[in-house]
Regions:
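Hydrophobic pocket/interface hotspot
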Residues: 24-28, 34, 56, 69, ...
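Beta-strand/loop substructures that line and gate deep hydrophobic ligand-binding cavities in soluble
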Residues: 83-132, 137-139, 143
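Glycine-centered tight beta-turn/hairpin loop motif at sheet-sheet or coil-to-beta transitions
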Residues: 8, 62, 86-88
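Beta-strand secondary-structure signal
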Residues: 12-14, 55-57, 79, 92-94, ...
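Short beta-edge strand/loop motif at the mouth of beta-sheet-based domains
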Residues: 12-13, 32-64, 73-77
Length: 145
């Protein structure tokens, strides 16, 4: 799965985590538990189980986001697309095993009128979200390892 490479706001990040890919996957795949380890997420609820086509709703920032899983390949890749307040987002996490644990790559794109008008602020917000999310994921996965 790929993010929208033509979108006006794209953010990427990577982090090394001292936990096996299966542990990192379990943290990412437990959608309902996201608010317990990621302070940027206030609510999260998955309906239909973790599979392509399933929908989850979550609250991050001022709006509630409705997202649909586009890719679910345990414990390698998870990706979704979603909409909130006129913003179209596409997000992907890729996990690669390493000698010390897991390298996680995250990428997200934002598109929509408001993103096009406020490109700079949108890019900064998106990059801060990727960086903060990866740091929180690392902390939780290493705690569970």
């Amino acid at each position: 799965m790929e993010v929208n490479k033509a979108a006006p706001a794209i953010a990427t990040g990577q982090i090394d985590i001292r936990a096996k890919p299966e542990v990192v996957w379990d943290v990412l795949a437990d959608i309902d538990n996201w608010p317990n380890w990621n302070p940027a997420i206030k609510e999260a609820k998955l309906t239909g189980g973790l599979k392509v086509g399933s929908v989850f709703r979550w609250k991050s920032g001022p709006g509630t986001i409705t997202s649909t899983f586009e890719e679910v390949e345990a414990p390698r890749e998870i990706g979704w697309s979603g909409r909130s307040m006129g913003i179209i987002a596409v997000h992907v996490h890729r996990l690669e095993p390493t000698a010390e644990g897991t390298k996680v790559y995250a990428e997200e794109s934002f598109d929509g009128l408001m993103v096009r008008v406020f490109k700079g602020a949108s890019r900064k917000t998106l990059q801060n979200g990727i960086d903060g999310g990866l740091a929180s994921l690392k902390k939780e996965a290493e705690r569970r390892a």
